[in-house]
């Protein structure tokens, strides 16, 4: 059986990247929550 996680940098950036997070209100909320928490990395 094939493993479920098949890494791809392109797909990773397109689905979880900073610019994608900035596009929607919910994504911006995620970034603000991570800023408030003091995360070192906001997005991948």
Curated annotation (Swiss-Prot):
It comes from the Bacteria. One of its GO terms (cellular component) is ribonucleoprotein complex. One of its GO terms (molecular function) is structural constituent of ribosome. Pfam families: Ribosomal_L34 (PF00468). Keywords: Ribonucleoprotein, Ribosomal protein. GO terms for biological process: translation. NCBIfam families: rpmH_bact. Belongs to the bacterial ribosomal protein bL34 family. This is Large ribosomal subunit protein bL34. The gene is rpmH.
